[in-house]
């Protein structure tokens, strides 16, 4: 990378015409059709969607210890959502919270995980956004499992996030709070998107930055306020993450840049993937964004223009570059249960459920062994009917068992399967979702949901449930082989 190092000294301020691009209307990352309109959700809806904000559904960076926790959930229409739950004192004035949320909720872009709605009941303050199923940039960049992120994909992340910020700026949202690798999410097709949660502060009077002070813009440390230029600085730290594959303080990176020590700066995993000129150009852009004086940093439009010219392998889909399966595909060959579900082979599904038995209900066995004899007898009669393929009778006895207040995910999936065999797909779906509420990581419940959704003609939702079930089953198998 040494041959072009002299370029580094030239910075792209917002006055530099070489990086300027004309305004482009109707860009691909503009308004997106098909995204639900911003709306209000009831607290009860969100409790059901998250199994009462169960720990298993926490997806935020610091888990349940974070002051504002993000959960994954599923609505009654089977759409997956992300829910940010603010701390009790974050937004005491509900009107102010609603006003801020509505402004962000007007944005609709393919480059963002769009805000779908809010909940403002009592002391609760919650935001609802599109769910992105393929983790965060931090996960893929700092904690990768099989292979590091490729150079072409890193450039794509940089471009897409810059386009997201440009879209926000063009629509009156010039400030983004605490931009970092955890704010970059990957959708079903593994395309990077910017979380809309960062467009609202964590509280009415709260801090705009929660990360280590070494990564915050210098002017924020001086004044406690952020500007559009502060967002550019944070974008520079993101470029630095992409360049190094590590989360290193900007001051250290700038020292390496000044010393022309670029070999130490760049991620060794990227060796041979880019030219000296391309590597030097990204280093230059990073350095420009990290300038101490805010006025010396480039504007977002010039960064978009510069990053467009660096793009590689633009014809290759993101999920291919990432080495991840596209939504609706399996990372490994499907299991017999997944194959039966995918092929709508209900008879084989019954046989597999019989083999599984009640081993996944072991934690709950005390609930019936110490309960009234009537409940035990009802379950046993239901099991006998299920084995005899008398599904009408199985439904009757399993219903008796559940009506007595018993809790069993296995009984619910068996009744769900019985409903499927009796051409009662809606009832089957309801039971499968209840089973998942009891055991959120049990793949069987998702397979039953997939089968029921397919019968109901909801093929896209069926395929998503099937893929999620396959992933959970693979994780369970992997965990069992490691023990």
UniProtKB/Swiss-Prot annotation:
Example of a GO MF term: protein serine/threonine kinase activity
Domain Protein kinase residue range list: 56-322
Domain of life assignment: Eukaryota
GO BP, sorted A to Z: brassinosteroid mediated signaling pathway
Active site per UniProt: 178 (proton acceptor)
Role this protein plays: Probable serine/threonine kinase that acts as a positive regulator of brassinosteroid (BR) signaling downstream of the receptor kinase BRI1. Functions redundantly with BSK3, BSK6, BSK7 and BSK8.
Protein name: Serine/threonine-protein kinase BSK4
Annotated source species: Arabidopsis thaliana
Gene that this polypeptide is encoded by: BSK4
């Amino acid at each position: 990378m040494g041959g072009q190092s002299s370029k580094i000294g030239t910075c792209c301020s917002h006055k530099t015409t070489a990086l300027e691009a004309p305004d482009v209307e109707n860009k691909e990352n503009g308004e997106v059709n098909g995204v639900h309109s911003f709306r209000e959700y009831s607290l009860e809806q969100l409790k059901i969607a998250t199994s009462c904000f169960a720990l298993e559904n926490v997806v935020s960076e610091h888990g349940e210890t974070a002051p504002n926790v993000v959960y994954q959930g599923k609505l009654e229409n089977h759409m997956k959502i992300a829910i940010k739950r603010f701390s009790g004192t974050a937004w005491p004035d509900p009107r102010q919270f609603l006003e801020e949320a509505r402004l962000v909720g007007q944005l609709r872009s393919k480059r963002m995980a769009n805000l779908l709605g809010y909940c403002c009941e009592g002391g609760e303050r919650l935001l609802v956004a599109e769910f992105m199923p393929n983790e965060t940039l931090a996960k893929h960049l700092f904690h990768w499992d099989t292979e590091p992120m490729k150079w072409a994909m890193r450039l794509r992340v940089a471009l897409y996030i810059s386009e997201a910020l440009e879209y926000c700026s063009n629509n009156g949202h010039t400030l983004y709070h605490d931009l970092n690798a955890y704010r970059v999410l990957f959708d079903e097709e593994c395309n990077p998107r910017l979380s809309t949660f960062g467009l609202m502060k964590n509280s009415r009077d709260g801090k705009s930055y929660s990360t280590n002070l070494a990564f915050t813009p210098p002017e924020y440390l001086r004044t406690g306020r952020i500007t559009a230029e502060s967002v550019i600085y944070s974008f520079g730290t993101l470029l630095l993450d992409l360049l190094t594959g590590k989360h290193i303080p900007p001051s250290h990176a700038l020292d390496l840049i000044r010393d022309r020590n670029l070999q130490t700066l760049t991620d060794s995993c990227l060796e041979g993937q880019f030219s000296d000129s391309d590597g030097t150009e990204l280093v230059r852009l990073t350095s420009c964004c990290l300038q101490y004086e805010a006025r010396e940093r480039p504007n977002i439009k010039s960064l978009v223009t510069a990053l467009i010219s660096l793009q590689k392998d633009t014809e290759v889909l993101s999920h291919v570059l990432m080495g991840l399966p596209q939504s609706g595909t399996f990372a490994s060959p499907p299991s017999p249960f997944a194959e039966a579900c995918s092929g709508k082979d209900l008879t084989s599904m019954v046989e597999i459920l019989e083999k599984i038995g009640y081993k996944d209900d072991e934690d709950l066995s005390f609930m019936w062994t110490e309960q009234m004899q009537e409940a035990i007898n009802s379950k046993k009669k239901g099991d006998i009917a299920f084995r005899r393929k008398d599904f009408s009778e199985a439904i009757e006895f399993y219903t008796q068992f559940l009506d007595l207040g018993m809790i069993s995910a296995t009984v619910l999936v068996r009744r769900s399967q019985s409903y499927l065999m009796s051409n009662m797909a809606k009832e089957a779906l309801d039971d499968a979702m209840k089973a998942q509420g009891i055991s959120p990581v049990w793949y069987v419940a998702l397979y039953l949901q997939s089968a029921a959704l397919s019968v109901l003609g909801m093929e896209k939702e069926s395929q998503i449930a099937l893929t999620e079930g396959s992933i959970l089953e693979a994780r369970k198998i992997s965990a069992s082989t490691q023990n």
